[in-house]
UniProtKB/Swiss-Prot annotation:
Record-level GO cellular component terms: cytosol
Protein's UniProt name: Probable tRNA sulfurtransferase
Sorted UniProt keywords: ATP-binding, Cytoplasm, Nucleotide-binding, RNA-binding, Thiamine biosynthesis, Transferase, tRNA-binding
Function comment: Catalyzes the ATP-dependent transfer of a sulfur to tRNA to produce 4-thiouridine in position 8 of tRNAs, which functions as a near-UV photosensor. Also catalyzes the transfer of sulfur to the sulfur carrier protein ThiS, forming ThiS-thiocarboxylate. This is a step in the synthesis of thiazole, in the thiamine biosynthesis pathway. The sulfur is donated as persulfide by IscS.
THUMP domain location: 60-165
Name of encoding gene: thiI
Organism: Bacillus licheniformis (strain ATCC 14580 / DSM 13 / JCM 2505 / CCUG 7422 / NBRC 12200 / NCIMB 9375 / NCTC 10341 / NRRL NRS-1264 / Gibson 46)
Length: 401
């Protein structure tokens, strides 16, 4: 039988009440973006389900991409037939005959979305199961652990038959919860933070601080590749590359070495906040995990956060490094993150950074230098690259938007 349909089931979207249509529309838009290479696919959506009509496109390739789209609870490759008993029986038998081998077991499960259908769920299971048994050899029923599990979904307009459910990414559709900026360094942690931000329905724009000649073009490319990898979960992402060399050089000259890391983080946050405001985002995400390094103690976070009233969200705050690495491997960012190209924070790491910096002290040290012109210059000269799951990218400058 020609399995030319994919049934998509929603997760948390189903709890959204009156706003459900907005979430479904966003999910449909995201799926279309991720599947833009598959030009023959057609989309049908209702309040409770979405159906993709493949029109001959590669089903396995389409499903491989759907696994990463947030907002999908599960999905199934399906055969479609008319909603009448004889048509369902014929389609079910033909589908099972294509799949089974002698000695296999099977089970039939029916869901009646169309309650006016002539048989109820139990009657349908018995009718279809009996029809299959009478017309196959060496195939038996096992309702607990079958080799073949035939699921039948009866709707008024059509009936769909499936044999396997694929787990989706869960969460909420990217973009349904607003926009946030992700501070991305090129390390292991920040892409994972971006993943979790997107899972909760946020559209992200990434911000990376680039300090040539201290950091190389290969380090920049690593961040581009990481951001591109995240596009698999929700479509295009803007990456803002901030020129940070002058600012870091001034920090090295004017701020005591043990407080230079704190000053660097504070200035990065101020620049990210200005970009957030310019691009109409509402929060900033970081990959910080409490106590992991000197700049991620509670005292450091307090001193750094003091430069902004914008929410700074840290989804990895309670995770240890092993957990973060496992998630990075799962989402395929780990191998990119461990490429041996250092970012600007690594290059300028002091030998003995202050692990419990005082907010009053860093404010005192910074008061002798006017960093504002360099902050504004960095924002104005920020380069923006629009990354997508397709091969090409677009270079733009931040002031274009």
């Amino acid at each position: 039988m020609n399995e030319d349909y994919i049934l998509i089931r929603f997760g948390e979207i189903s709890t959204k009440g009156k706003n459900r249509k907005l979430f479904v529309d966003r999910l449909k838009r995201n799926i279309k973006m991720v599947l833009r290479d598959f030009r023959n696919v057609r989309y049908e959506s209702t309040r409770d389900r979405m159906t993709l009509v493949l029109n001959g496109e590669d089903a396995e390739a389409v499903m491989a991409r759907l696994k990463h789209v947030f907002g999908i609870q599960s999905f199934s490759l399906a055969v479609k037939c008319r909603t009448d008993l004889e048509s369902i029986k014929e389609t079910a038998l033909a589908s099972v005959q294509e799949q089974y081998k002698p000695g296999d077991t099977f089970k039939v499960s029916t869901k009646r979305a169309y309650k006016q259908f002539e048989l109820n769920t139990n009657e349908m299971n018995a009718e279809i199961g009996g029809h299959i048994l009478r017309n196959t050899d060496d195939l038996t029923v096992d309702v607990h652990s079958p080799d073949i599990h035939l699921r039948i979904e009866i709707r008024e307009d059509a009936t769909y038959l499936t044999f396997r459910d694929e787990k989706g990414a869960g969460g909420l559709p990217v973009g349904s919860g607003g926009k946030a900026m992700l501070m991305i360094s090129g390390g292991i942690d920040s892409p994972v933070a971006g993943f979790y931000a997107m899972k909760r329905g946020l559209e992200i724009e990434a911000v990376h601080f680039f300090s040539p000649p201290y950091t190389s073009e290969r380090a920049k490319q690593k961040v581009i590749d990481l951001t591109k990898r995240l596009t698999a979960f929700g479509g295009d992402i803007k990456l803002h590359i901030v020129p940070f060399t002058k600012t870091q050089e001034l920090i090295q000259k004017q701020i005591p070495e043990n407080y230079s890391m704190t000053a660097t983080r504070r200035l990065m946050l101020q620049i990210a906040d200005k970009l957030r405001e310019r691009h109409n985002a509402l929060a900033i995400f970081t990959g910080e995990s409490l106590g992991q390094v000197a700049s991620q103690t509670l005292e450091s976070m307090y001193a750094i956060n003091a430069v902004t009233s914008t929410p700074v969200l840290r989804p990895l705050i309670g995770m240890d490094k092993t957990e973060i690495i496992e998630k990075a491997k799962e989402i395929d960012t780990y191998d990119i993150s461990i490429r041996p190209y250092e970012d600007c924070c690594t290059i300028f790491t002091p030998s003995a950074p202050k692990t419990r910096p005082k907010k009053e002290k860093i404010e005192h040290f910074e008061s002798y230098t006017d960093f504002e012109p360099l902050i504004n210059e960095a924002v104005e000269n920020t380069e923006t690259i629009v990354l997508s799951s397709k091969a090409e990218t677009k270079d733009q400058f931040a002031d274009f938007f």
